[in-house]
Amino acid sequence: MSSKLTVHRGLATWGEKLVPLAAFRQAAAREGLALPREERESAMLAYTAGLDDPTPVEGPYSRIAVFGGIYSNHLALLELLEDAARRGAEAVYCLGDLGAFGPNPEKVRPLLAQGQVLAIQGNYEESLAAGREDCNCGYTDPRDNHFAEISYRYTERNCSPEFKAWMGTLPQRRRVRVGEHELLLVHGSPRRINEFLFHSTAPVPFLEVLLDQSRCDGILATHTGLHWHRHLPSGRDVVNVGVIGRPANDGQTHVWYSMIEAREEGLGVELVPLAYDHLGLAAEMRSEGLPEEFVETVLTGWWTTCLEILPARERAASRF
């Protein structure tokens, strides 16, 4: 009797061994009728993901701070480093988009070094390092792209060649162990650097497949600018860790990041509001000639740009 093709924690095996990809495909074909199609596809994708992703696992840690989208907000970054230290973070991770939206992006880099922040590329770093013409933000609406272009051109002009070259050295993903949980850190999603994972349009079955394909116990992402956490039936977690560059379109001026920790009952996720000198940031933005629409968001907590990408539920919660 032949060995059965099985899937355990997102890792595909043949019998008790991992086998070469060609042999795996032959075995899957022979046993195809014994498995539902979706399980076969998930197994194959998980196996190939393991071959293609040699990312080393960092840690282990008991508690880490994770955030995305600095958007040049050096004032919020300074507050975050102090707050994360007070909360006992053993490491601090940034999921990309160091520049954009805010003023004077060069002020961010020394703070990253000072705080020993471990970063990955977002679409901004990827584009700036490669000298691309746009931010590859993933917007489709002309108004969204209009303001995205203003933001990108400003950031491009105000980042030194050395800073852009350093951005090019950043990885696009990290794997981190928190307690017994192996977490994958990405900017948009494991599939694309600029994929938007909104809470209302990321159903549980889809997230379970992403986790299977990525061979991990949790995915931490950003890019949308809106924080959320979903604990799945499989016991795994997907978190949009929030951004510290601008408010979360909720009428509040604070920004958001996440504390991730190991607990006896599983992975602990705390979405943390962070106050900072938003009046100082608004004044600096005006002195740099950035659009008043950007300044209004900082002062009111409501987005005035990049709204058209929002799904219906998230847009319904908006002021505009």
What are these regions (language model features)?
Residues 10-111, 115:
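N-terminal active-site segment of His-dependent metallophosphoesterases
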Residues 40-48, 59, 231-320:
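Acidic, His/Gly-rich catalytic cores of divalent-metal-dependent hydrolytic chemistry
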Residues 67-68, 92-97, 101, 118-123, ...:
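Active-site neighborhood of phospho(di)ester-bond hydrolases with catalytic His/Asp-centered motifs
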Residues 76, 98-115, 129-140, 196, ...:
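Metal-dependent catalytic neighborhoods of phosphoester/phosphodiester hydrolases
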